[in-house]
Amino acid sequence: MAIESIEINLKTQNCRVFTTDGIVDYPCSTALNGPGEQDGSGCTPRGSHRIRAIIGLGEPANAVFVGRRPTGERWTEQLHEGYPNRDWILGRILWLCGNDSGLNRGGKVDSQRRYIYIHGTPPTEPMGIPLSHGCVRMRLQDICELADQVSPGTVVTIVES
């Protein structure tokens, strides 16, 4: 199954993956602050993007990342309790780069410079509800499955409906 493209729907909180074999849907969670492109907004950027980098291949599904680097920690409920306010980035990171100059590429709206990712989140976090700080959160099993099949350059389109 080769992945052709990905669509993130902000209204339905769904990650739709278009493959040579059909369509696969995954629940996701985007920004609590809604759609938007400005640096510092905490919003999920709209428009056409591409996967710049895939980070974490070969790491355990519950590997913890800070600054796109594995910390050596493994997420557990006990670790979570010790850091209740941490914005957990787990498992895999698909780092997005905007394709639309002026909308999500360049200046104060650059998705890559804003560190917008599709990444794993703890199983205690709900899907289908916008709660992130701008990234697209997915269940650990789902992001690991997606990261294993996607390649850099894959187009990711983020739409409002």
What do these predicted ranges mean?
Residues 9-18:
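Gly/Thr-rich phosphate-binding beta-strand-loop-beta motif of the actin/hexokinase/Hsp70
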Residues 1-4, 27-41, 73-80:
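N-terminal post-signal-peptidase region of extra-cytosolic proteins
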Residues 61-161:
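Exported/periplasmic cell-wall-interacting domains
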Residues 10, 22-50, 55:
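Glycine-rich catalytic cores of cysteine/serine-nucleophile enzymes that process amide/ester linkages
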Residues 20-21, 110:
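A short, structured loop/turn motif at beta-sheet edges
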Residues 13, 55-58, 161:
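Short, charged beta-turn/beta-strand-edge "cap" motif at the junction between a beta-strand
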Residues 1-9, 146-147:
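Short linear motifs in intrinsically disordered
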